[in-house]
Regions:
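N-terminal non-globular leader segments, chiefly Sec-dependent signal peptides
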Residues: 1-17
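Pre-active-site segment of Zn-dependent metallo-hydrolases
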Residues: 14-32, 38-82, 86, 90-101, ...
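Beta-strand-turn-beta hairpins that frame and shape the catalytic cleft
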Residues: 27-33, 47-53, 109-116, 162-169, ...
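Structural motif
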Residues: 53, 80, 167-169, 192, ...
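Short internal beta-strands
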Residues: 78-86, 194-196, 220-225
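P-loop/Walker A phosphate-binding loop and immediately adjacent motor/lid segment at beta-alpha junctions
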Residues: 93-120, 209-227, 244-252
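Active-site-proximal loop/helix segments of hydrolase catalytic cores
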Residues: 144-216, 229
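Binuclear metal-ion centers of metallo-dependent hydrolases, dominated by the metallo-beta-lactamase
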Residues: 216-292
């Protein structure tokens, strides 16, 4: 009874949503879309009209035996908070100051110049390509069922498609690489895919990431779910994505934690990787201290 959402204690309000509610521009409105990286699998997307969305904010494991992150997720206010699935490194929507929370969305939500579609599928449950084979360890060491169709809730995954600024942006979450054809059909054409790729190949192997990118034919591929030395702990086992990124043709390394993308620029690309690397869109607390 003492746990749960704490919005009742927040001093903020949803006046920004009331203002935007009166305008209701079309989802295809022109203008740049800002993509900001917050480490882990967390991205803030800002539509041309100024609607802000945070997908997959992270937290440390609630059982407290070890940490994945060196500090708490930054204090951020957004209009809409979203999560792809119920794992600690993706589900911390409660730490945000958000006007709307869409946790594991299945179906469609539309507001202002944004349309969000959630497609139900399954989390990766075969991790033999990873050095630690964490999925097999989970099955052996815990009562948790990871294999579909009888998996536990935390091994569901919702693919999230954000449509705004003339772009269709897909957040893959930790989805399996081989969803059924019916899911691929629902995904449709994608301009930008946010894909989980790291040097340990925790979620997708290099070959799986390449295959997903090829199947989607996305214009830009943005890696996430990778290790950053001053964000993630060594205990996470995550590694930087450099090997995979540098193995792709004409990859772009960002020079900051956010970028503004226009439909004209994105649609001129063809399977090009855009990686934020160690850059994030907040001041890293450890960088202001004395070191790790």
């Amino acid at each position: 009874m003492d746990e749960g959402l704490w919005a009742w204690r927040q001093t903020e309000n949803h006046n920004h949503m009331i203002e935007m509610q009166e305008k209701l521009p079309a989802p295809a409105a022109d203008g740049a879309v800002e993509l900001a990286f917050f480490g882990g699998s967390a991205f803030r997307i800002t539509s041309p009209s100024g609607l802000t969305m945070m997908i997959d904010p992270w937290r440390n494991p609630p059982w407290g035996t070890w940490n994945w992150y060196l500090y708490d997720f930054p204090k951020v206010a957004v209009d809409i908070a979203l999560s792809t699935h119920a794992h600690f490194d993706h589900d911390a929507v409660h730490v945000l100051t958000a006007n709307v929370i869409l946790d594991r969305l299945i179906g469609t939500y539309e507001f202002a110049d944004v349309k969000i579609t959630g497609i139900a599928d399954k989390h990766v449950s075969d991790s033999k390509h990873n050095a630690y084979d964490w999925a097999e360890m989970t099955r052996r060491l815990t009562p948790m069922k990871t294999n579909p169709p009888d998996n536990c809730r935390s091994f569901d995954n919702c693919l999230l498609i954000i449509e705004t600024g003339g772009l269709r942006i897909l957040h893959w979450g930790d989805n399996r690489p081989n969803p059924p054809d019916s899911v691929w059909d629902k995904i449709g054409d994608i301009d930008i895919v946010l894909l989980p790729v790291d040097g340990s190949y925790h979620v997708l192997s290099a070959a799986q990431a390449d295959a997903v990118a090829e199947r989607l034919q996305a214009k830009l591929i943005v890696p996430h779910h990778y290790g950053i030395w001053d964000v993630t702990t060594r205990g996470s086992t995550l590694l930087p994505p450099d090997e995979w990124v540098n193995g792709r043709k004409d990859s772009i390394w960002a020079d900051g934690g956010s970028v503004k993308l226009t439909a004209d620029f994105v649609k001129q690309q063809s399977g090009r990787v855009f990686c934020f690397g160690e850059h994030v869109a907040f001041d890293k607390p450890i960088a202001r201290g004395t070191g790790a």
